[in-house]
Amino acid sequence: MFLRICIGLFIYQQQYFTFATFSFNQPRFRINATWNSNATTFANLSFVGTEPYSIFVNSNNSIYILDINTGQIHIWLNENHLNPTKTISGNLSYPLSLFVTTNGDIYVDNGNNRPVDKWIRENETWISVMNITSRCYGLFVDIYDNLYCSMYHNHRVDKKWSNDITTIVAGTGVQGPQSDMLQNPVGIFVDINLDLYVADFGNHRILLFRLNQRHGITVAGYGSANVTIELFHPTGIVLDGDQHLFIVDQGNDRIIGSDENGFRCIFGCSGSGSTNDKLSYPYAMSFDSYGNIYVTDQDNNRVQKISLSKKSDRKYENCSIFSKSTAKIPFFTFD
């Protein structure tokens, strides 16, 4: 048994520093890490219903899956449980997305009912936290508790700040291919610098919006400045611990990964299907702490677990440190 310690080193210059904790996993991988070519089915139609959308794996490796048909959230405390440990019900109508915070609160898009609702773990009650005009196909809560909603039908991403003010942070509300526009945004991810990544479904690209910038940079897919990889209707975007992109490329029924050598297909690379080496219309993905990938496989009505091929493909445990200053903080891990 090993004790793993994360240490941040810095020189004090009348600035202050904050350790950031995440509710999700951002493992770090060695160059050209691989995942098993055959996945295993973690949850089937009995628990995820038809066409599962959102999934969230927290830092304790608890797994949260939305059933859009019943409006329920199924929770597995760990992958070894065959059946959900807990099921949460509420007045949810066709919910599409969810996000779980470090204290176990759950934000959920309430679909046809329109508001974003929050399930409070402490007293197991529901409250509405964000009024919206269109359902959220992606939800995210950043390290300052700001809430983001990607509106597929409104072609924009809204941000509700912790002071209850809501602003548009990406897109104009009118669909288009320009750098300040979106066409049917879906998955979103906000990094430690509060930079926003958007899976721009209709424009076949991943856009990066730097903090307080309304023009995005195409970092993958159609229109990227550097040759990256061709995407077709991307729906999911997550970052690993080295800020490398992992993309659910729904229209191509595959998952794309990246590292220092660029982009590559890591699963579902031979087309659509229902066998364990294929996906059909995948929607969202989430890492566990070991670097395994969980993905909602919509047309197959299942959630698949794609295991990292070798433990040695993972560098070391996550150590997330955030600085209020612009200075870089080196950090190390020791076994």
Model features per residue range: what roles?
Residues 40-46, 82-89, 124-130, 167-178, ...:
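A short beta-strand motif characteristic of beta-propeller blades
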Residues 22, 42-71:
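Beta-strand-rich domains and repeat architectures in extracellular enzymes and scaffolds
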Residues 60, 68, 111, 152, ...:
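Short loop/turn segments immediately following the C-termini of beta-strands
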